[in-house]
Regions:
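Intrinsically disordered, low-complexity acidic Ser/Thr-rich regulatory segments
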Residues: 1-105, 169-181
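Forkhead-associated
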Residues: 74-161
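Short, charged beta-turn/beta-strand-edge "cap" motif at the junction between a beta-strand
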Residues: 161-166, 171
Length: 181
């Protein structure tokens, strides 16, 4: 998983300034909302979630504001980008496997959990669950397997029980700018 931390990125923004920061961070980003002790362990096999756990994960509410959800220092930040040499250039894979474009080596994430895609003009983003064991939720609603669901700036996405906020490149830069003040 990424070693990028929100506060470190805020410091980088202060060093670079707005225009240079936006050039340096041209990709969508995920900010982890719920890192818990014991849940950051690297896992080889997928751990299953009970039906009650799935329901509880999908019932958790959206943050009141985008900045409320990102106030905790040290939050993990993941770049949503294609890794060099990765297959399937039309999508960005996310999963527990080390060779996933966005690697989440967490016990309740499938090896290939899902993927991000985008519209031809790059103005819209989508997430698709690849038939994972513990599901993907967008805004608290379970995503049907193999169905692309639109995501916009600030949308909460859960991969199994792990919650993230999705940011477009401009949305992420705006978030970091507001934190840098």
């Amino acid at each position: 998983m990424s070693d990028l931390r929100l506060e470190e990125i805020v410091q980088k923004y202060r060093q670079l300034g707005d225009a240079a920061f936006r050039n340096a961070y041209p990709h969508p980003m995920l900010v982890r909302r719920d890192a818990r002790d014991g849940e950051s362990e690297v896992a080889f096999h997928t751990a299953f979630m009970s039906r009650d756990m799935l329901r509880q994960t999908s019932e958790l509410g959206q943050p009141d504001t985008l900045t409320d959800a990102t106030r905790e220092p040290g939050q993990q930040v993941l770049k949503v980008a294609k890794r060099a040499g990765g297959p399937f250039q039309d999508r960005i894979g996310i999963g527990r496997a080390r060779n996933a474009d966005v690697s989440l080596p967490l016990p309740r994430v499938s090896k290939y959990h899902g993927y991000f895609s985008w519209s031809l003009d790059g103005s819209e983003y989508f997430v698709t669950d690849a038939g994972s064991k513990n599901g993907t939720s967008v805004g608290g609603s379970l995503v049907p397997a193999k169905q692309a669901v639109p995501v916009s700036n600030g949308t909460e996405i859960s991969f199994g029980p792990y919650r993230f906020l999705f940011y477009t490149p401009d949305g992420f830069a705006d978030l970091i700018a507001s934190r840098a003040r």
